[in-house]
Amino acid sequence: MAVHHKRAGSHRGRGSKAGRSRGRKFETSRLKDVSQDESSGKEENEHVEPEEEMDDSEASDVSSESDLDEPPKENSYSTLLKLLNSNAKSSEPARKKRKIKADEQDTTQVEVSMRTTEDVKQVDEVADTEASEDENMDNEGLHEEDDADGIGSDGNHDMFEIHFGNPDETELSKRIESCSRQWKSTKADLIDGLYSVASKPDVGDSLSTSLPTTPSPADLKLKQNLAKAAVSFDGLNSCLTPYIFGYYDTLFCSRTTHNSAKLRDLYCLHALNHVLKTRDRVIKNSAILSREDSGDIELRDQGFTRPKVLIILPTRQACVRVVDSLTKLYPMEQQENKKRFMDSFSAADSDDWGHKPDDFKELFGGNDDDMFRLGLKFTRKSLKFFSQFYSSDIIISSPLGLRTAIEKEGGKKLGNDFLSSIEMVIVDHADALIMQNWDHVEYIFSNLNLQPKEAHGCDFSRVRQWYLDGHGKFVRQTLVFSAFNTPELNALYNTQMQNVFGKAKIMPKYEGAMLNLRLPVSIKQTFSRFDSASPLKDPEARFQYFTRTVLASLARGWIESSSGKGKSGGTLIFIPSYLDFVRVRNHFANSSQTENISFGLISEYTSVRDSSRARSHFMNGRHSVLLYTERAHHFRRYNIRGVTNVVMYGLPDNPIFWGDLVEYLGSAASGAVTPTLRVLFSKWDALKLERVVGTARVRSMLLEKGGDTFTFV
């Protein structure tokens, strides 16, 4: 069920254009009739519109003169005049030959004849040199790092090379073919109570179930500018590094407020490394093709469109944190439109949140708008904010923001071609996205790696074969970080995370949220199991059990007291699903079972004013019952007073909410009234139940044949 939030306007504008450069000095120029085959030395990225290319090249030339090669000591213009004077009788324009060695001072040694084959060859070498200079200007720091990042020199140990750069086509085809069959899985214990379940397609070899080893930072083959950010890893990073940098699809279900910054830095480091290595390969291959006379060389190093990394986040402030991490790991001298970005994405925390929990402050602190999208483009030493999607390297967006970019009103598609060549998808704070509208996330994944409807300037001779075959989804890496696992995430893992090189689910072993309650005295916690044939029939079975068993018992207590504040007064009924909430609300309003009961309502759609009134009436006893949804608690974290009984229509997804709800009983526990807690669950609630009662207890509670009621004190 969608949740209504405030919406901000779309921010899809272009980044501001930088001033034009002053151009190359005449000392490094050539005459018109010299071959101008320098296409590889222009903008390094292959999928940018011509107009955008011009803008980017102008922007990248700002303050770039210091990066040019030093000119020869002797003025090339003087040399050119001497050449022209020596060939004054020639009917053809003379050609300048730039000196390659700066320490050659004797201009009399310059040959004046420009018609020989050797001269033409040398002039072509100068053209290649200048083209290379253009590439270096736009992509400084890429080529000199080749030896450090493993490209071309140690590709056998660089996972980028194995996975994307130069994969074994035969092995890749074999894995794609076996992807629809059985996968081999291996379970392994990790650190701090974590364990992993890693899977690979069964291709008939003994390596299919082998887990990756934990590398040291030096083994990651990072770009030199990024390597200093990975001097050492702590326990969590060492645990995740082999999966993330090994290009495994990874579902990590132990994200907390304490490790979120480390996780963010880790996946930003990986995303930057992937983008920079991809650009480096494209530029180097372009230089190779520009020097080859024959068209026999085939270099496939690109996708259909430029965007390579998609990061899905819940709020604008989360986007600010990711950008801060990117710029910290890869500092750039110029950041175009940074002020516009900060003005529209960042905000200060509310001063009224001193009592709010840390997870609430992390999610909703600052600008909590969930309607945004942002393109980031990396050129040389500049980072361009608000670049057009087809000109971007990284796209950061909320699910709603990206969906509205794909669709127009009325369901008419605007286009999803910019998602056709995404090679890495990162979904952070996935548990918060579930509370927004998970349907948007599923829609985005259904639009990934499809065949584009338009060319968008694509050079199909350089498109990787698996894209042409429609197999991009089998090579794409997907990283999902969540505080806990849910059926929605499991479905995403099983259907959309199809990386043929492997995938892993990393889960914690739970002690149980019910053991960490902050209460003055212990409270009896009763769990009631009901039978449910299937997930589709679970809502009906749950409602019937609630009305016939739980509500009937509560109603007897309400009837005994005409004031409604008898034995069952002060009852908070927590309902995770809004659909179930509507059904229970209608039952309270229309059933004879509850016709004399005064009740209040707080859902995610209830206004702040109505919520305050319902809480006040419940605290004062005017309402005997308060119906309260999980999303309402997620977005507002109310401190509800006057609670003496808690009935959980279903277990909360977030185990933190369990503690919040049970601790509402704290004031009653210290008084004369004996508080009660009753929870309904079925076998389809296994993931939720495990987080509450602990990994060691959940199996027996789901399979116990002796009874369906379990009590803990």
From Swiss-Prot:
Please describe the quaternary structure of this protein.
Component of the ribosomal small subunit (SSU) processome composed of at least 40 protein subunits and snoRNA U3.
- The biased composition feature labelled Basic residues covers 1-23
Keyword match Phosphoprotein: no
Protein name, as recorded: U3 small nucleolar RNA-associated protein 25
Q: Which GO terms describe its biological process?
A: maturation of SSU-rRNA from tricistronic rRNA transcript (SSU-rRNA, 5.8S rRNA, LSU-rRNA)
Q: Which InterPro entries match?
A: P-loop_NTPase (IPR027417), UTP25 (IPR010678), UTP25_C (IPR053939), UTP25_NTPase-like (IPR053940)
List localization entries.
Answer: Nucleus, Nucleolus
Q: Name one GO cellular component term.
A: nucleolus
Described function: DEAD-box RNA helicase-like protein required for pre-18S rRNA processing, specifically at sites A0, A1, and A2.
Residue stretches of biased makeup (Acidic residues) = 49-69, 125-149
Biased region (Low complexity) positions are 78-91
Similarity section = Belongs to the UTP25 family.
Q: Give UniProt keywords alphabetically.
A: Nucleus, Ribonucleoprotein, Ribosome biogenesis, rRNA processing
Record keyword Nucleus present: yes
Q: Where is the composition biased (Basic and acidic residues)?
A: 24-48
Could you tell me which residues belong to the region Disordered?
A: 1-158
Q: PANTHER family under this entry?
A: ORF PROTEIN-RELATED, U3 SMALL NUCLEOLAR RNA-ASSOCIATED PROTEIN 25 HOMOLOG
Give me the disulphide-bonded residues.
none
Q: Name one Pfam family in it.
A: UTP25_NTPase-like
Q: Which GO terms describe its molecular function?
A: rRNA binding; U3 snoRNA binding
